[in-house]
């Protein structure tokens, strides 16, 4: 540990540039699914333990489409649509029945959904780790001490575009306004003529679509595996806990913060502690 600290701040401080960049790339992906969780939690009071599994599912859908030689922008669009429909279906089958139930009911239901998705993905894709091999090259700086894969740059750009689209949608669209009104006071929203059941269904489907988009980016720059969903669920809960519900700027800031925290933890204590770092926030 002491040697790693010396490496960071005395012998090779330029490594901090690599860690900060990696933290930014990580945070951009985390922010998408974390905001979806914040919406579902804030609007419906559902703590979705299957959140990370939605991300992994989106990654596997992207991997399948990539093997069909479909261009990446089209893959992203298709995955978002499929996950939106999937999320709406899960709402009708499961979530709709537990909205007004005790918190532990929602935790048990979504935990069961998480286990089901893990086993289905394992059945279809196997337990091996997989990734989308973009073969895009990268940028080397500071005599090779800092490496930036072009796939990570692309993922950051795509995450920024999606985030801007979400901000515009939530502020300008009627459904976005209905979601915010329902989050503030569901009864008042119903009095004003808002179909809260439709808002709930759309919110959960929208969350699944954001997870799907995050999954595409995860498959591009890391690896996916059927049982990795729990790690993303923990990260999302840590981000939402730090940022608060329905606060997109806060979610983005917390996502970048946790991304940096993870990378520095991995560098100082070892990669075995990297994924465990967000747990300290909960």
Give the location of each predicted region:
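Helix-loop-helix "hairpin" substructures at the membrane interface of multi-pass membrane proteins
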Residues: 26, 145-225, 248-253
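Membrane-embedded helix boundary and interhelical linker motif in transport proteins
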Residues: 21, 43-89, 93
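Transmembrane alpha-helical segments in multi-pass inner-membrane proteins
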Residues: 70-81, 204-211, 215-280
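Hydrophobic core segments of alpha-helical transmembrane domains in multi-pass membrane transport
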Residues: 59-63, 80-86, 111-121, 158-167, ...
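Transmembrane helix-bundle core of multi-pass membrane transporters
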Residues: 4-5, 97-172, 198-202, 264-272, ...
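Alpha-helical transmembrane segments within multi-pass membrane transporters and channels
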Residues: 37, 70-113, 120, 253-258
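Short, non-helical or kinked segments that cap or interrupt transmembrane helices
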Residues: 37-59, 100-105, 175-178, 196, ...
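Membrane-interfacial amphipathic/re-entrant helices at transmembrane-helix boundaries
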Residues: 1-32, 61, 72-75, 101-106, ...
């Amino acid at each position: 540990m002491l040697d790693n600290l010396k490496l960071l701040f005395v012998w090779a401080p330029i490594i901090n540039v690599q860690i900060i960049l990696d933290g930014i790339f990580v945070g951009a992906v985390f922010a998408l699914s974390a905001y979806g969780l914040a919406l579902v939690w804030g609007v419906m009071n559902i703590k979705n333990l299957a959140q990370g599994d939605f991300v992994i599912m989106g990654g596997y859908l992207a991997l399948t489409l990539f093997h069909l030689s479909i261009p990446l922008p089209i893959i992203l669009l298709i995955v978002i649509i499929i996950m939106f429909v999937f999320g709406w279906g899960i709402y009708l089958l499961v979530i709709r029945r537990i909205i007004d139930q005790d918190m532990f009911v929602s935790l048990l239901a979504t935990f069961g959904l998480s286990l089901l998705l893990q086993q289905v993905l394992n059945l279809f894709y196997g337990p091996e780790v997989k990734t989308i091999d973009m073969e895009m090259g990268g940028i080397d700086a500071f005599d090779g001490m800092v490496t930036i894969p072009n796939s990570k740059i692309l993922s950051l750009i795509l995450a920024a575009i999606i985030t801007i689209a979400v901000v515009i949608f939530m502020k300008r669209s009627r459904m976005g306004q209905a979601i915010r009104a329902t989050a503030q006071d569901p009864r008042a929203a119903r009095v004003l003529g808002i179909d809260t059941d439709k808002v709930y269904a759309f919110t959960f489907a929208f969350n699944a679509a954001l997870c799907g988009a995050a999954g595409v980016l995860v498959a591009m720059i890391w690896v996916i595996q059927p049982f990795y969903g729990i790690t993303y669920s923990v990260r999302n809960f840590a981000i939402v806990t730090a940022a608060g519900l329905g606060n997109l700027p806060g979610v983005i800031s917390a996502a970048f913060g946790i991304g940096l925290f993870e990378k520095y933890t991995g560098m100082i204590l070892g990669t075995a502690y990297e994924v465990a770092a967000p747990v300290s926030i909960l």
